[in-house]
């Protein structure tokens, strides 16, 4: 009896009946107007193919680049202990931090995680690295360099006020409670027994006992200076003392053709469409002065004049005009109350492309940072400031002495500055394009060790103990 072969039509019909039976069981519908079940089988087939490809790729990766094995790099991390090791001349050396390892290798390599059994196959050397160096050197993003130094005085009304210094390296939060000084505002401060007045330009020495000067400036007799820190004193530019330059031969008759009662050193005025203009008589001419200078000159010596006499403009224009270098501003000042506005800040900012930095003096009720950033402050142990940073900084400082080149520093998020000797060292740490920063503020940060390759290649038995550590505050997690 011969074999009876099936035809394609029979096979197709059999498959159709099976599909129809599936629809009857799963969907309870045998009409088969559509066939959604076909997608299930296709997805299963596709999933199997993808799984096979993934397994094949994993097998190839494990063969050509096995995990936990030596080879391909000289920087390793023990998978069991997380100890960092660097391979030097066939010896495996423990290293204190990633920064030291990168300095040793000369490139910003990342460690490969290796099994302890693999590391034990290599001869072991002494620990190398720079004690006290940062573990790594991350840098916060941003094209604008902003550095701010703030003094906050507590108990300003008392006989022993306390000054707290803060270093801020992050964008500022400026609002009505803390904002830049206006041209008519000033702050009275003291440093080492001397009195200074701080304006938008900087600090000026002033003698509060000179009532002729202070009354013309609108400084009340009840105004009292409050102390500032050494860092703030050095950061604020010295704009010279606020005192009137002496006038030679003051009180002598003039030889300029003016009335006899206008002796040298006296003040007169002319009326213009913009208001009165004041002039002081000098030995060889006259000099225009602002209203505050005129008031100060008259309060010092009025030369018998009850009020500045008015002169005819046509007479004045025929007299030689000179310059009287008065440092006083154009209008009386409003003295900021430190008990109400205890924070005094000097801010330095330079953006990419700026030819020179911009500095601003601010005053207000609190530090110019957000409330959330207030909790980020780090009170340094060996420094005098509390530091607020939004990440690491790589900065370049230009020395005012032309004999010296610029200095580069890496500043970690804890506010410790580390010297970077040159651009090659910076490159090995993954640092580039340093931002400018003011030495007046950076100098207040705690100075860490220099990050150099020679220092990283030194071997150590143990780390020296910190001679003056600080106990963790009570109430902190894990503290007694």
UniProtKB/Swiss-Prot annotation:
UniProt remark on cofactor binding: Ca(2+) has 50% activity.
Gene3D superfamilies: Type VII secretion system EccB, repeat 1 domain, Type VII secretion system EccB, repeat 3 domain
Enzyme class, first EC level, given as a word: hydrolase
Effect ascribed to mutating residue 102 to A: Retains 40% ATPase activity (in residues 72-480)
Region (Structural repeat A2/3): 265-323
Predominant place of localization: membrane
Free-text note regarding domains: Has a discontinuous central core of beta sheets stabilized by a disulfide bond that is flanked by 2 structural domain repeats on each side; the protein forms an elongated 'S'-shaped structure. Repeat A2 (approximately residues 265-323) is farthest from the cell inner membrane and is quite mobile, swinging on 2 inter-repeat loops (A, residues 234-264 and B, 324-341).
Stated name of the protein: ESX-1 secretion system ATPase EccB1
Organism: Mycobacterium tuberculosis (strain ATCC 25618 / H37Rv)
Gene name linked to the record: eccB1
């Amino acid at each position: 009896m011969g074999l009876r072969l099936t035809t394609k039509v029979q096979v197709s019909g059999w498959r159709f009946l099976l599909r129809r039976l599936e629809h009857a069981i799963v969907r309870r519908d045998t009409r088969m107007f559509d066939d959604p079940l076909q997608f299930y089988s296709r997805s299963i087939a596709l999933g199997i193919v993808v799984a096979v490809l993934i397994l094949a790729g994993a097998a190839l990766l494990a063969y050509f680049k096995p995990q936990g094995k030596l080879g391909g790099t000289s920087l390793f991390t023990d998978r069991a202990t997380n100890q960092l090791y660097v391979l030097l001349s066939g010896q495996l050396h423990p290293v204190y931090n990633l920064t030291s390892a990168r300095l040793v290798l000369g490139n910003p390599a990342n460690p490969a995680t290796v099994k302890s059994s693999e590391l034990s196959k290599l001869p072991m050397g002494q620990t190398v690295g720079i004690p006290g160096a940062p573990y790594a050197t991350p840098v916060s993003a941003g094209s604008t360099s902003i550095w701010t130094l703030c003094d906050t005085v507590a108990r300003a009304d008392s006989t022993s006020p306390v000054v707290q210094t803060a270093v801020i390296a992050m964008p500022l939060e400026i609002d009505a409670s803390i904002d830049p000084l206006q041209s008519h505002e000033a702050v009275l401060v003291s440093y080492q027994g001397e009195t200074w007045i701080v304006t938008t330009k900087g600090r000026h020495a002033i003698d509060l006992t000179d009532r002729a000067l202070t009354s013309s400036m609108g400084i009340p007799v009840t105004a009292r200076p409050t102390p500032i820190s050494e860092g703030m004193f050095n950061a604020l530019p010295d704009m010279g003392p606020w005192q009137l330059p002496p006038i030679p031969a003051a009180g002598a008759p003039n030889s300029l053709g003016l009335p006899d009662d206008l002796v040298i050193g006296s003040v007169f005025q002319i009326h213009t469409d913009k208001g009165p203009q004041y002039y002081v008589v000098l030995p060889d001419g006259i000099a225009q002065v602002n209203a505050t200078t005129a008031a100060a000159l008259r309060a010092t010596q009025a030369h018998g004049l009850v009020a500045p006499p008015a002169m005819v403009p046509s007479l004045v224009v025929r007299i030689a005009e000179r310059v009287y270098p008065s440092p006083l501003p154009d209008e009386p000042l409003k003295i900021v109350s430190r008990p109400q506005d205890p924070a005094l800040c000097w801010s330095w900012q330079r953006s990419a492309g700026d030819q020179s930095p911009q500095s601003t003096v601010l005053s207000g009720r609190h530090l110019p940072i957000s409330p959330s950033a207030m909790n980020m402050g780090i009170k340094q142990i060996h420094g005098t400031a509390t530091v607020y940073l939004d990440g690491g900084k790589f900065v370049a400082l230009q020395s005012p002495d032309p004999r010296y080149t610029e200095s580069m520093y890496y500043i970690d998020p804890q506010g410790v500055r580390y010297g970077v000797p040159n651009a090659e060292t910076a490159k090995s740490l993954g640092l580039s394009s340093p931002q400018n920063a003011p030495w007046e503020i950076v100098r207040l940060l705690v100075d860490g060790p220099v990050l150099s390759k020679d220092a990283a290649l030194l071997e150590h038995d143990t780390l020296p103990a910190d001679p003056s550590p600080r106990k963790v505050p009570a109430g902190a997690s894990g503290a007694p």
